Each structure stands twice: as structure tokens, then as C-alpha cells.
């Protein structure tokens, strides 16, 4: 049976192979000197870890006490611990309120896996005995509603839809009212994929947020941005724009199993102080896992 840790290692293999092989080459029968430090710095930057974070890691790495002979596994252990420290703000639990409706706004650009992720989240919480509903606010694509319906059925959740091309904010409004009426525990609001620099679509998202707050000034309980791990450095722009509109509470990272750019998560967490609630490490409904910075850091360097 494949453990969660082994599945994570497999998912991060594209990034970890680069880092692990690079460290093996840099420290093969070599001393720890300025040349090797420079090579290590270049390797980490090439893995999409931000320059700011890499600089900090290298400075800390210089102060690690090593034996006279240093091997690559020892270096990997040290780097993993330093990366884990950089991710200290990432492991805030995804908490829900008891005895009230939790409104979870899900947003992101096109193709990051929002619908699939909502299906997996719905299944996760339905299995825990929660009453789950999903608002289909991507109203301009009939295919999106059909795809969402399939996932929601598998999760034994309630799907709340509007007419095709209906105002997404009106669907969100009705979904909240219906969820309150039916004593729903969690309402996931699925929004249309939108480019972060498309003003009209971002205004539409802003309108959804305003409508939510009309019904509950403390809502949404969570505003979550779905990030495709393949995105790389553009992750920073996406977080910045969506955060301005929705006041993000956290991130979910998808498609780790297909990315060679997973290192970007380290810098993103450090810059925006946002937790990573879940990570997607496969296509199956059970392949959405709670983020664990210790396991992630070790897997990232191939340990």
C-alpha cells in the first residue's frame, strides 16, 4: 500500500529530481566552500524558490555545523530543515465553525482544477458527516455546471444552480439562503475561472463577495485561491490580484504530480503569509491531502 508520504514523494519527483541530483553533483567529493555555496544557491533558484528565500536559506546553511567531510544526504537534510522553517506560516489548519453555515469561496484562473477540488472537498466533508452544498456560480458555461454536477453527485452533496448566463452573484445569494433553510454545514461557492488581470471578471468576483457580506458580514468563512503547481513564478501575481478582491485566507495547490516548479510555494507562503490548506497529489477523489510542511520539505529535496 502506498503511504501518503510516498505518494507525495512521487508527486514532487519532477522538482525533487532536479534538486536531489543537483546536490549530489555539487557535493560529490567536494568541500563546503564559496564555490559550492554559489552552485547550491543557483540550483535552488532554478527550482523556482524565490531569490529572497534562497538567500536566507544559504545564509542559515553557512551556520550549520558539519563534519569535515560533507556528503549530499547531509546537505539535503539540512536544506529540508531550512525549507521547513521557511514554511512555518503555511500549516494553519482549515477550521470550520460549528452550528452555523460555513461559506467557502473558491476562486482561481482557468484550468487550475477548481471544480475537481470542490468535488474532492465535498467528498471529504460529506464523509465526516457534514451537510455540504455547492453553488454553481460559473453560469456562462453549461459544461462547467455538468462537470460540477458529476462531482457533487459522487460526494453526496447538494448542488444549487441558476439559469445558464444568470448573474453569478444572484446564484450565490440564493445558494446561501437555501443552505440556511436546509441547515447546511458547508457551502462551497464555485466561481468561473478568470485571468487575474481581467477587470470585468474580477469585478464580477468582487460583486459575489459583496453579496455574501450582505447576508453575513463575517462571511465568507474562507476565501481560497486554487493554484496550479505548474504555474511557477506567475503564482505571485495571481495571489496578489485575487487577495485584493477577496481577502484570501489560504491556498490549495493542485497538480503537484505534474509540476517541476513546486519550489515556488516556499516563496509564495513567505511573501503573502498565507497557509496552504490542502495539496492535490493525484486525480482520484481521495488525492486531496492536508498540507504537511515537514513531509513537503523532505520530499522537495528527494529525502
Swiss-Prot record:
Could you tell me which Gene3D superfamilies the record lists for this protein? P-loop containing nucleotide triphosphate hydrolases, Signal recognition particle SRP54, nucleotide-binding domain
Q: Which reaction does it catalyse?
A: GTP + H2O = GDP + phosphate + H(+)
Subunit structure and binding partners? Part of the signal recognition particle protein translocation system, which is composed of SRP and FtsY. SRP is a ribonucleoprotein composed of Ffh and a 4.5S RNA molecule.
What does this protein do, in the record's words? Involved in targeting and insertion of nascent membrane proteins into the cytoplasmic membrane. Acts as a receptor for the complex formed by the signal recognition particle (SRP) and the ribosome-nascent chain (RNC). Interaction with SRP-RNC leads to the transfer of the RNC complex to the Sec translocase for insertion into the membrane, the hydrolysis of GTP by both Ffh and FtsY, and the dissociation of the SRP-FtsY complex into the individual components.
Task: Give an example GO molecular function.
Answer: GTP binding
Positions binding GTP in this chain are: 108-115, 190-194, 254-257
Q: Which NCBIfam families match?
A: ftsY (TIGR00064)
Q: Which UniProt keywords apply?
A: Cell inner membrane, Cell membrane, Cytoplasm, GTP-binding, Hydrolase, Membrane, Nucleotide-binding, Receptor
Taxonomically, which superkingdom? Bacteria
- Its GO biological process terms? SRP-dependent cotranslational protein targeting to membrane
Q: Which family does it belong to?
A: Belongs to the GTP-binding SRP family. FtsY subfamily.
What is the recorded name of this protein? Signal recognition particle receptor FtsY
> Do you know which HAMAP family this protein is assigned to?
FtsY
Q: Where in the cell is it found?
A: Cell inner membrane; Cytoplasm
Family matches, as InterPro entries: AAA+_ATPase, P-loop_NTPase, Signal_recog_particl_SRP54_hlx, SR_rcpt_FtsY, SRP/SRP_N, SRP54_GTPase_dom, SRP54_N_sf
Q: Which organism is it from?
A: Rickettsia typhi (strain ATCC VR-144 / Wilmington)
Is the keyword rRNA-binding assigned to this protein?
no
What Pfam families does the database record attribute to this sequence?
SRP54, SRP54_N
Q: What is its main location?
A: membrane
The UniProt record lists the EC number as 3.6.5.4
Tell me what topology the record assigns in the membrane.
Peripheral membrane protein
GO cellular component terms listed in the entry, alphabetical order: cytoplasm; plasma membrane
* SUPFAM superfamilies with a match to the protein in the record: Domain of the SRP/SRP receptor G-proteins, P-loop containing nucleoside triphosphate hydrolases
Amino acid at each position: 500500500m502506498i503511504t501518503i508520504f510516498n505518494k507525495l514523494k512521487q508527486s514532487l519527483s519532477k522538482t525533487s529530481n532536479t534538486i536531489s541530483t543537483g546536490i549530489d553533483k555539487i557535493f560529490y567529493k567536494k568541500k563546503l566552500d564559496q564555490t559550492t555555496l554559489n552552485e547550491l544557491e543557483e540550483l535552488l533558484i532554478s527550482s523556482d524558490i524565490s531569490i529572497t528565500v534562497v538567500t536566507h536559506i544559504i545564509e542559515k546553511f553557512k551556520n550549520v555545523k558539519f563534519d569535515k567531510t560533507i556528503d549530499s544526504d547531509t546537505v539535503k537534510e539540512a536544506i529540508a530543515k531550512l525549507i521547513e522553517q521557511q514554511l512555518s506560516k503555511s500549516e494553519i489548519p482549515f477550521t470550520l465553525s460549528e452550528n452555523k453555515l460555513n461559506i467557502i469561496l473558491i476562486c482561481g484562473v482557468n484550468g487550475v482544477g477548481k471544480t475537481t477540488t470542490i468535488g474532492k472537498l465535498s467528498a471529504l466533508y460529506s464523509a465526516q458527516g457534514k451537510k455540504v452544498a455547492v453553488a454553481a456560480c460559473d453560469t456562462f458555461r453549461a459544461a462547467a455546471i455538468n462537470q460540477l454536477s458529476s462531482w457533487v453527485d459522487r460526494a453526496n452533496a447538494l448542488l444549487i444552480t441558476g439559469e445558464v448566463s444568470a448573474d453569478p452573484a444572484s446564484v450565490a445569494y440564493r445558494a446561501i439562503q437555501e443552505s440556511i433553510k436546509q441547515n447546511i454545514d458547508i457551502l462551497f461557492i464555485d466561481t468561473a475561472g478568470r485571468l487575474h488581470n481581467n477587470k470585468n471578471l474580477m469585478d464580477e468576483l468582487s460583486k459575489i463577495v459583496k453579496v455574501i457580506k450582505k447576508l453575513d458580514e463575517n462571511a465568507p468563512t474562507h476565501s481560497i485561491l486554487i493554484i496550479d503547481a505548474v504555474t511557477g513564478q506567475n503564482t505571485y501575481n495571481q495571489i496578489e490580484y485575487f487577495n485584493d478582491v477577496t481577502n484570501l485566507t489560504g491556498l490549495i495547490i493542485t497538480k503537484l504530480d505534474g509540476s517541476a516548479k513546486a519550489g515556488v510555494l516556499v516563496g509564495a507562503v513567505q511573501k503573502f503569509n498565507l497557509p496552504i490548506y490542502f495539496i492535490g497529489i493525484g486525480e482520484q477523489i481521495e488525492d486531496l491531502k492536508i498540507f504537511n510542511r515537514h513531509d513537503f520539505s523532505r520530499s522537495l529535496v528527494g529525502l
